Regions:
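Short, solvent-exposed amphipathic alpha-helical segments in soluble enzyme
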Residues: 136-137, 199-204, 230-233, 262-263
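Short, acidic/small-residue loops that bind anionic groups at enzyme active sites
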Residues: 139-152, 187, 201-224, 239-240
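Phosphate/pyrophosphate-binding betaalpha-module
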Residues: 121, 125-187, 191-194, 198
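C-terminal functional extensions of proteins
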Residues: 216-274
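N-terminal acidic, proline/glycine-rich, low-complexity intrinsically disordered segments
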Residues: 1-9
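Residue-level recognition of the N-termini of beta-strands and the immediately preceding loop/turn
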Residues: 115-118, 211-213, 242-245
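Solvent-exposed alpha-helices and their adjacent loops that cap or buttress functional pockets
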Residues: 72-75, 111-113, 136, 156-159, ...
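Glycine-rich beta-alpha loop segments
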Residues: 11-20, 28-29, 34-37, 43, ...
């Protein structure tokens, strides 16, 4: 009966040792140049290659896979995504509302077993920090999807360390914001907040993603920031598109709106009632 091959070979294969300088005095210097050359690095270890224009598609794929792998490892199936200005300080009333909202969501998901509903933010300061901080206050997991910027944006200290991710591409970051979102809560903010809000509104409008409750916190701000009724009057949107979002003022009203939205559709969020 033939014995299976051993894990280790008994004899070396050709090339397992470099050419001896006894055979060629110049071999050692030539070998050192080859081993130090970027071209000889394996592709996965060649940072220069991985950052070339031609490998952009690979980088996008890696950003998708890294975040997806980590979220699956932690069994994150549902998120409540919070957007808002990075510029708002702790003294802002909106900061306190966002913190309280994060606490409510965090409390509702505690000790619920698999697939609990978690806060997800952009991982930065301001409103993002407040929502992560509220979840942290409640002892709950929360997620931060930070972004590499020309000037470093550090993550806020309240994101769960194992769920703090950093992205190179806004596009892939926004993809992960949308992928598990069961609700979107948007506080006052600037261009970045508007971009994130309108991305979700467009995806819901076109049914590229299932509609989710979108709550704009601070009606007075939002009435001035954009005018959907004007868009309707100009024929740019349909009447039903006005129903893609609602307004709220408090953390409790925001959370209750989200819970009621899902309950009316017969698919309540997997969390305990507040």
């Amino acid at each position: 009966m033939t014995e299976p091959p051993a894990d280790e070979r008994q004899r070396s294969l050709p090339g397992e040792h470099p050419k001896s300088p006894h055979d060629d005095p110049d071999a050692a210097e030539a070998m050192a140049r080859i081993m130090a050359s970027d071209s000889y690095r394996e592709a996965a270890e060649d940072l220069g290659f991985l950052n070339e224009e031609l490998t952009r598609g690979l980088r996008l794929q890696l950003e998708y896979l890294k975040a997806e792998t980590l979220l699956r490892q932690h069994d994150i199936r549902h998120t409540v995504v919070v957007f808002g200005s990075a510029r708002l300080a702790e003294t802002s009333p909106w900061y306190e509302v966002a913190r309280e909202f994060g606490r409510l969501v965090g409390q509702s998901g505690l000790n619920r077993g698999e697939g609990c509903t978690c806060i997800m933010t952009g991982g930065g300061p301001g409103i993002m920090e407040a929502a992560n901080r509220g979840a942290h206050d409640a002892g709950a997991l929360s997620i931060g999807l930070n972004i590499t910027l020309p000037r470093e944006q550090f993550p806020n200290p309240y994101v769960t360390p194992e769920l703090a991710l950093r992205f190179r591409y806004f596009a892939m970051r926004k993809f992960h914001f949308a992928l598990r979102a069961r609700a979107l809560v948007v506080f006052p903010g600037g261009y970045g907040t508007m971009d994130e809000l309108f991305e979700i509104l467009e995806l819901s409008q076109t049914r590229k993603m299932p509609p989710v409750p979108v709550v704009l916190v601070g009606e007075r701000f939002w009435r001035r920031a954009f005018d959907p009724k004007f868009l309707l009057e100009q024929g740019m949107i349909d009447p039903e598109d006005l129903g893609l979002f609602v307004f709220a003022e408090s953390a409790d009203a925001t959370w209750r709106t989200i819970l009621d939205w899902h309950a009316r559709r017969g698919a309540p969020l997997p969390c305990a009632p507040v």
